[in-house]
Amino acid sequence: MKKTVERLLNKMCLMDDTFMTVAFDGDRDAVGLLVSIVLNRKINISYVQTQKTVVNSEGKKIIMDVFAMDDEDNVYVIEFENNPNRAAYPRLEYYKDMVSNIVVQFGTPYSKIRKRYVICFTRGDAAKTGQAVSQTVTKWKDTDKGPESYGVIIYVNVKKNEGDEPIAVLNRDLVQRDFRKIKYRELRECCRRVKEGEGKKIMCDKIRQMQATIREEERAKAAKMVTEAREEERAKAREEEKAKAEQQRNAYLKLMIENHIPLEKICTILQMSVETVIQQAYLLGCVL
């Protein structure tokens, strides 16, 4: 079991949800590197939390892969989505709008919130632009220096990983399973910590939990299949019994008609209405 868990751990990369959750949690350097490369400027991250749960005013719960703040009160939500079709723009827009509520909970006045970024790394061109990085400014606010971008949604196509540009190197690092081959030191160290260091036990426990969940789901699925199969057999048996009873009733009906049993008596014996007997006799080709 231990070797199986470690083998699964060694196959994981930063695009895998559970591994990413453990690797990036609290790692300001690694998350700062991600944001800095995507925005093409140095960003100093002051706070990081993975799997940040937020509940809106209607009671709807959302979970953000990575929630971060920098030392200038800018806010970042970073999502990792292997299926680009699931990286829907409305979903990211909703995340962006929820960010302000989180920041206020941290004690930052609403008026001091500067910019809100939602960065989504996907294994494909979710933005349909053909670019490695696609940015959409969704809101503007007036400042004493004029209009300033307020909400920004950014898609990063992880498959755009050829060349030596920082974003291409980053994209290769995100899917690299062997942490020793990761180029950026910050990412290499956060992966090493989970695969060989103090985070390994946490990650192995999570893998065991996933395995237990999968086994439980498989048992539940198997039990459901057995139940459905038995119910199908019962339904089939009921239909066969019904058909057999109807066939027997028709045989009795035909026999009684051929022996000139009165209609009223036939209805009494077979517990059928006059109309039903007449209809069934017609279908059997019998003459009353």
Roles of regions detected by a PLM:
Residues 1-202:
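Conserved single-residue anchors adjacent to enzymatic active/cofactor-binding motifs
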Residues 1-12, 69-71, 76-81, 166-288:
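Short, charged alpha-helical interaction segments and adjacent helix-coil junctions
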